[in-house]
Regions:
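Post-transcriptional modification and biogenesis factors for structured RNAs
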Residues: 1-178
Length: 178
């Protein structure tokens, strides 16, 4: 099974974030990075590594959000994460920084002209799975920075799966390939 880090970049829905936490926990993801405007649970309530949350900057450790906003978002994420937010090592990064993953293969989950079908993809031993915004996906300028682009074939009339559903499908395929 490959070593996997997941990045959820610019995901709007707290319910999607919670479901992504729960899915990451189920597939043994090493770390979840929430970046951009993706909502994130209360950082001050998380245990320190190696048991749970990673915090890259001390200023982030003391959660900068207003208490009522922080508590509301944490409750909303918990509704679908059901405690997985306390089990999956995570951190919040305001900006997407793919350069920090030396030694990892960066794989975007997106529909693009150069994407490879998830069914045909052979995952490397260490990878970062990049997820993008629910409606617009991952911008072209970001896709130009990744090593591979994979997509889930669609057989119905809709263009794409919900991001949390797609995460589950992709993680299943990546962890059971080979």
């Amino acid at each position: 099974m490959p070593e996997i880090i997941v990045i959820a970049h610019n995901i709007r829905s707290t319910h999607n974030v919670g479901a992504i936490f729960r899915t990451c926990e189920g597939f043994g993801v090493q770390r979840l990075i929430l970046s951009g405007y993706t909502p994130y649970p209360d950082l001050s309530l998380q245990p320190t590594p190696p048991h749970c949350a990673y915090h890259l900057e001390e200023t982030v450790r003391a959660d900068p959000r207003l208490p009522h906003i922080r508590e509301k978002i944490t409750r909303q994420i918990h509704k679908t994460a059901l405690g997985a937010e306390a089990l999956v090592p995570f951190d919040y990064q305001p900006e997407l920084d793919l350069e920090q993953f030396a030694g990892y293969h960066i794989v975007a989950l997106e529909q693009a002209p150069t994407s490879v079908s998830l069914q045909q993809y052979q995952p490397p031993s260490k990878l970062v799975l990049l997820l993008g915004e629910e409606v617009h996906g991952i911008p072209a300028e970001t896709l130009s920075l990744v090593d591979d682009i994979i997509e889930i074939p669609m057989y119905g009339q809709k263009e794409a799966f919900n991001v949390s559903v797609a995460t589950g499908i992709a993680l299943y395929a990546l962890t059971t390939a080979g």
